[in-house]
């Protein structure tokens, strides 16, 4: 799981161009204002939620995970080293200025027993 406060920052588009997959960076660059900001944070939190769930965190390349950037369509579109169909991704929006995501490997969940992996910072 990852949750971030939606805060305008100078270099978000540059970060997307350097770190995200080309299609994600293009989708963010095609937007303006609040829409671009929300798309960036949707992308970031979805990637980070997945990478935390795998146990690699931000040590793995961000462009190896391709996600949707739209508010209403959380999805893992492709993975460099895994099957995107093996993952469930949900958007989390606890407040207007917070965007987040939860990623769960579907095979880790057995009738009433979700596998939980706690990561410390």
Language-model segment annotations:
Residues 1-121:
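Core catalytic alpha/beta fold that binds nucleotide/phospho-ligands
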